[in-house]
Amino acid sequence: MARRPRTIGPSASDPGFSPQHALELVRSAIPPVHPAGRPFVGAGLALALAGRRHRWLRRAGLLAAGACAGFFRHPPRVPPTRPGAIVAPADGEICVIDVATPPAELSMGDVALPRVSIFLSLLDAHVQRAPVSGEVIDVQHRPGRFGSADLAAASTENERTSLRIRTPGGAEVVAVQVAGLLARRIICDAHVGDKLSIGDTYGLIRFGSRLDTYLPAGAQPLVTVGQRAIAGETVLAELP
C-alpha cells in the first residue's frame, strides 16, 4: 500500500504556521517599492477601485499598478566586504568603458579619468546606490536634453545630476545620473556632508536612463562592455 507523501515545509495545520509567517514569506519574495513609486502604484489601484464594475478599466488599473511596482522596485542588495571595492551604482548593461573628463560643473579640472557607463532599460530596477563608502563633497544638477540614454552624446548633452564622494582614504568617485528619452525626472536624496556606506540607496531615475561612474586615476575596470551589472554588488573596479 502506497504511503501518502510527507509534506515538506509549513502548512496551515502546522503549529508553527501563522498569518504573520506567511506575510514574512511574501515580503521576502516580493521586493519593496521605492517611496517615489508609491503615488504611481496608488494611482493604478485607485483606477482599479473606481472601475471595479468595469472589467477593462479594472484590469487597466491593476496592470498599471503592477507595472509601476515592478519599475520602482527596491530589491535588497548585499555589497562586497573586501576593502577598496567600487560597486555598480545601478542595475543595467555596461555600455561604455573609456576615459573621459568628469562633468565640468564639479570643477575637477580637465584630467580624464576612467569611466564606466551603465544603460538602464525600462525593465531594470532604477534605484541608484553609493559606489563606495565616504562623504558626499559635491552634488550638482545640470539641465539639458532628453536624448536617448544609450547614445555617446547623452553623457555630455542630457540633463544630469553628479554626485562626488570622497572615501576615508581620500580617493574620489563620481556617479552621474543621466536622464534619457523617457527619463524626465532625476531624484537625488544625497546632500553635501552626508556620509554614505557602500550600497546605500541615494537616488532614482524615471523611466529608462544611464549612470556614468568616474573612477580614481589609476583604477582598472574589472568589467566588460555588454556585461550585466547589479547595483551595490557588481564590482566595477578597485581603489588604486
UniProtKB/Swiss-Prot annotation:
The UniProt record lists the keyword Coiled coil: no
PTM characteristics: Is synthesized initially as an inactive proenzyme. Formation of the active enzyme involves a self-maturation process in which the active site pyruvoyl group is generated from an internal serine residue via an autocatalytic post-translational modification. Two non-identical subunits are generated from the proenzyme in this reaction, and the pyruvate is formed at the N-terminus of the alpha chain, which is derived from the carboxyl end of the proenzyme.
Similarity comment: Belongs to the phosphatidylserine decarboxylase family. PSD-A subfamily.
Function of the protein: Catalyzes the formation of phosphatidylethanolamine (PtdEtn) from phosphatidylserine (PtdSer).
Gene source species: Mycobacterium avium (strain 104)
EC identifiers of the protein: 4.1.1.65
Gene: psd
Record's GO cellular component terms: plasma membrane
Cell membrane as UniProt keyword: yes
Assembly notes: Heterodimer of a large membrane-associated beta subunit and a small pyruvoyl-containing alpha subunit.
Main location: membrane
Cofactor annotation remark: Binds 1 pyruvoyl group covalently per subunit.
Subcellular location, record wording: Cell membrane
EC supergroup of this enzyme: lyase
Record keywords, A-Z: Cell membrane, Decarboxylase, Lipid biosynthesis, Lipid metabolism, Lyase, Membrane, Phospholipid biosynthesis, Phospholipid metabolism, Pyruvate, Zymogen
PANTHER family named among the record's database cross-references: ARCHAETIDYLSERINE DECARBOXYLASE PROENZYME-RELATED (PTHR35809:SF1)
Residues recorded as bearing Pyruvic acid (Ser) in the entry: 209
HAMAP family: PS_decarb_PSD_A (MF_00664)
Pathway assigned in UniProt: Phospholipid metabolism; phosphatidylethanolamine biosynthesis; phosphatidylethanolamine from CDP-diacylglycerol: step 2/2
Cofactor: pyruvate
Identification of the protein by name: Phosphatidylserine decarboxylase proenzyme
One example GO MF annotation: phosphatidylserine decarboxylase activity
Record's catalysed reaction(s): a 1,2-diacyl-sn-glycero-3-phospho-L-serine + H(+) = a 1,2-diacyl-sn-glycero-3-phosphoethanolamine + CO2
Its membrane topology: Peripheral membrane protein
Residues at the active site: 209 (schiff-base intermediate with substrate)
GO terms (BP aspect): phosphatidylethanolamine biosynthetic process
InterPro entries, per database record: PS_Dcarbxylase, PSD-A
Cross-referenced Pfam families: PS_Dcarbxylase (PF02666)
